[in-house]
Amino acid sequence: MDDTYTINVTPDKRFSGREIGDIAVAMVVLSIAFVILYRDSQFMWYLGYAYGDVARWPILIVTCFGLVFFSFLLHEFGHKFTAQNFGLRSEFRMSRIGLFITLITSLLGFLFAAPGAVVINGYPCLLYTSDAAVNIVLAMVGIVGCFAFNHTPLVFVFLMLANLNAFLAFFNLLPIPPLDGSKILAWNAPVYVAAMAVAALE
């Protein structure tokens, strides 16, 4: 990858202007990728059945953007605020190549979600489990919501919340550098196996 990650963070500042911009671009690209990925899925069939062929596209787009923004922000907050609790600095940096790969793979029917990475001025591996934990919890919320709101229009939102976050957790835990899974496995194999098992079950 030809992207160069740099970090220049004021210690008492939560987010820099560049980080906010990088997060915004990454969220938009990832949202578009999920819309492309779900375009021929059972989600679209359900939306067409429930709301008609014309309405299903705007509903899918709004839902994907809303859930990706919500899930991605909490995912990155997991990194940032955990790092700050350790007295460390962290910032998200988008990857142009990663964003391109994310879009191209979604067109091919699968998703390699690599919009960027979090740069941390330290290496406490507990930090690398925090974002996956956020996605696992959100997936569980989605599953519970599916049961609680079954046979209502909201079941679609919770089903997509569960599907999207289970995917993000599982993908991020793959033991492939530079994904967090490779760092967690090198740090503590039992923790990695437990986290991956939970993500896979969801």
PLM features per residue range, with description:
Residues 1-202:
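Hydrophobic transmembrane alpha-helices and their immediate loop junctions
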